[in-house]
Structure formats: C-alpha cells, structure tokens
Amino acid sequence: MSASTLMVLSSLLFATMGVCVKYASEFYSSGEIVFYRGIVGAVTIGFMVWRRGGSLRTPVPAMHFWRSLSGVLALSLWFYAIGGLPLATAMTLNYMSSVWMALFLLGGAIIMGGARIDGRLIATVLAGFAGVALILRPTIDDNQLWHGLVGLISGMLSATAYLQVTALGRIGEPEYRVVFYFSLGGVVAGALTMLAGGANPHTLQGVALLLAVGVLATVAQLLMTRAYATGKTLVNASLQ
C-alpha cells in the first residue's frame, strides 16, 4: 500500500476519532481521554508484539522521549480544544499542522543553506489547508478564543511530532515501537492529570467512546507512522 493511501486512511480514522473525542468530552476530561487512549494503544501494541514477535527495546530512547513529549502535549491540547470549540473549528486548527510542517521545513532549508524544498509541495499543502477550511467553515466566538489558541498550539506541536516520526522511520524504527512509546507517554501524562484533578465515573456510553477513541487512534497512528517513514514528508502533510 502506498504512503499516500496510508495517509488518507489515517486521516479518515483520525477524523472519526475526533468525533468520538467530542462526544467523550461530555463524560471525561481531556487528561482522562488521553490516559485511556494510551492504555488501549499500549495494550494493543504489546499484544501484537507478543503474538507476532518483535522487540520494544530501542537504541534511540531519547528520540522516542522527545517524540512522545511533543505528541502527547499536542494530543492533550487538541482534546482540550475539542471540548470547548465547534468540532469543525477544532479539526481545522489541528489540520494547521501541515502548514506548520511546511514552514518548519522551509525555515530549516533556509538555515541549512544547501537544502532545497519543492515550492510546488508547499503550495499544495497551503491549497489543501485552504480547501479544508472552506469545507469545514470554522467559526469561533469571543468566549472561545482561549480554546482556539490552545488548538493552534496543538497544531504546531503536532507538526514537530510528525517530523520526529519521520526521523524515527528514516533510521529504521518500526512503526509499532514508535506508537507504543507514544501511547505509553499518553498513559503517564494522563495518569498525572487524573491524580491532580480526579476521575469521572464511567458509563456504558462513555466506556464505548473511550474504546472507540483508543482503537481508532492506534490504527491511525500505525498507518500514519508507516506513511511518514516511507513517503515524502510534505506530500503526506498535504493529505493529512
């Protein structure tokens, strides 16, 4: 399966997950959703490794740490933004990650001097984001500006995390290992917020939503990680 196809499927699953997160935010805090999402991901990947073989031991723990840190922060902020914004607005702000990636890569190319970035790809990314904005038609009220700023920051952090995913894939780290440590980071961060702020009681609907968020996110992360490892970064970003 091509990287572009993997990215499209991943984006579809992430969008579906966003809907589930919006509904789940009526029952749980963003920290709780991050925690349970991480639990589902870590357990699923651990079971896959146990059944199919492989190893969770990594030669680059520092890279996984920084990828997990930026990714979990981005995820937590996005879930928080989803809870306080119209879903279309929250999704649009998250899709800003592709624009941030283009800016980061362009800035890096300028600083490095010799590196070249295809201007057509950057134009494609910007056009893609404009198309998303036109379709979703995001709106925001004055009392939602804080959540909007949080959503914007989450998109920037997501771009950083995606670039780190690309770097991990380029050095040969398998996607299951990348997703496992990211999920583990979510468990730790979510647990800390729950210790500080407490936890809400479960309902059947709430548990079903948490399970859906975890499964959709895990599969989407695996597909996205493979896409960034094998495809062109900006091409993937334009499809996100």
Language-model features, listed with the residues they occupy:
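Loop-to-transmembrane-helix transition segments
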Residues: 2-10, 49-50, 54-79, 146-154, ...
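Helix-helix packing/entry segments at the starts of transmembrane helices
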Residues: 90-96, 172-185, 221-240
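Transmembrane alpha-helical segments that form core, pore/gating elements
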Residues: 45, 139-198
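C-terminal transmembrane-helix exit sites in multi-pass transporters
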Residues: 80-83, 97-121
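Structural signature of hydrophobic alpha-helical transmembrane segments
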Residues: 26-43, 82-100, 144-157, 203-217
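Hydrophobic transmembrane alpha-helices of multi-pass small-molecule transport proteins
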Residues: 103, 117-137
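Juxtamembrane helix-loop-helix junctions in multi-pass membrane proteins
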Residues: 12-40, 160-185
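Transmembrane alpha-helices of multi-pass small-molecule transport proteins
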Residues: 3, 28-73, 101-104, 157-161, ...
